[in-house]
């Protein structure tokens, strides 16, 4: 951490650590009020996914705009772009595969648990993801990853571009910030459990996040605001610049029932039927993932998709941590003053959702209807 002689923070690590401590304090207060007294520590887990482009260095050296700005400033559109969606998750070529193998080796030597890599939507665009970790550590790992990524690419005669919009006509690059809370024994506070409708703890933390994103939406948006990233957001290739949350049908119906009827209605179980006897009926993934939403609940975490590929994930997580901590403080104050904690928990869930459900949008974030509704 870097700070001045007078104690002013000179980097993003100090504010990030402060935000995690504030969030830990309020989360422990809420858990204690709910009777969960065993928890002593709260860990803010994040898992950034890093997108990037690879360009052959001999072509890179011929482009002054790429060398000076990290992006193209002029030129023609490629003869073939991403129209057929045939690049995404396609077979990785030998040259890039060898590069990725060495990249993984170098990252593992640094203690960075790189796990997955695949082709992204645009030609020569790729992604690497690491195993989630505590926010402070994961932020450091992502900074190191970007540096090692560029260094290893040069060894293989390529240049890794981290600019959010290096080429016109194809997708830009970002990084998805997967965010969740857990106790020191590994209990995920955003895991719905088997009886979702009866899990008041989960519903309380869920609605607290919803309220935080609504009340502090300008800060959450500012966390992803850079010149390069603003050029990428909202162009039907990345999440829209309007802050919204995708919950999925089941969670939305349960929260609507609490608001309208005062109790939890059990969500309908849905199954995927392939019409083939050799394949069983499988439970439908009720969280979907709605790629047009800037923030989506994906099973046991929230995925914040607006962060730019060259950004530090510290800033966005400082804002998310601080916003959620502020709302949890309100919840803790109410629970600690309540005579009937369970009843008050129901009331908090209802109040948080009823007052801030406007930020929930499960439809197409690129549609004109959503832009009109958001206004």
Language-model regions, residue ranges each:
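Glycine-rich, acidic/polar active-site loops that bind/position phosphate-bearing ligands
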Residues: 1-162, 167-175, 180-375
């Amino acid at each position: 951490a870097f700070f001045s002689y007078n104690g002013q923070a000179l980097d993003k690590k100090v504010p990030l650590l402060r935000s995690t401590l504030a969030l830990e304090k309020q989360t422990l207060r809420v858990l204690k009020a709910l009777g969960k007294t065993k928890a002593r520590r709260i860990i803010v887990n994040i898992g950034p996914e890093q997108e990037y482009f690879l360009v052959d260095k001999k072509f890179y050296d011929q482009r002054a705009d790429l060398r000076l700005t990290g992006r193209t400033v002029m030129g023609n559109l490629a003869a073939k772009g991403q129209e057929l969606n045939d690049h995404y998750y396609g077979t990785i070529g030998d040259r890039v595969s060898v590069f990725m193998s060495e990249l993984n080796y170098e990252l593992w030597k640094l203690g960075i648990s790189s796990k997955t890599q695949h082709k992204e939507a645009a030609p020569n665009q790729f992604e690497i993801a690491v195993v989630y970790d505590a926010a402070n550590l994961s932020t450091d790992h992502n900074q190191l990853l970007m540096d090692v990524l560029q260094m290893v690419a040069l060894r293989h005669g390529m240049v890794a571009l981290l600019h959010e919009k290096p080429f016109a006509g194809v997708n830009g690059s970002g990084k998805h910030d997967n965010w969740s809370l857990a106790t020191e024994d590994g209990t995920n506070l955003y895991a719905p459990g088997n009886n979702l409708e009866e899990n008041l703890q989960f519903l309380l933390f869920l609605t607290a996040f919803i309220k935080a994103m609504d009340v502090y939406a300008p800060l959450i948006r500012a966390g992803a605001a850079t010149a390069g990233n603003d050029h990428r957001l909202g162009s039907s290739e990345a999440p829209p610049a309007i802050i919204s949350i995708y919950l999925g049908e089941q969670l939305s119906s349960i929260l609507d029932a609490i608001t309208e009827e005062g109790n939890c209605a059990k969500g309908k179980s849905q199954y995927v039927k392939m019409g083939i006897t050799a394949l069983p009926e499988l439970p439908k993934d009720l969280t979907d993932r709605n790629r047009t939403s800037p923030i989506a609940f994906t099973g046991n975490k929230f995925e914040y998709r607006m962060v730019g590929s060259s950004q530090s994930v510290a800033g966005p997580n400082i804002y998310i941590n601080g916003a959620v901590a502020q709302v949890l403080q309100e919840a803790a104050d109410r629970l600690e003053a309540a005579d009937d904690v369970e009843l008050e928990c129901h009331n908090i869930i209802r109040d948080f959702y009823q007052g801030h459900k406007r930020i929930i949008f499960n439809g197409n974030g690129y549609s004109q209807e959503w832009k009109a509704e958001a206004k």
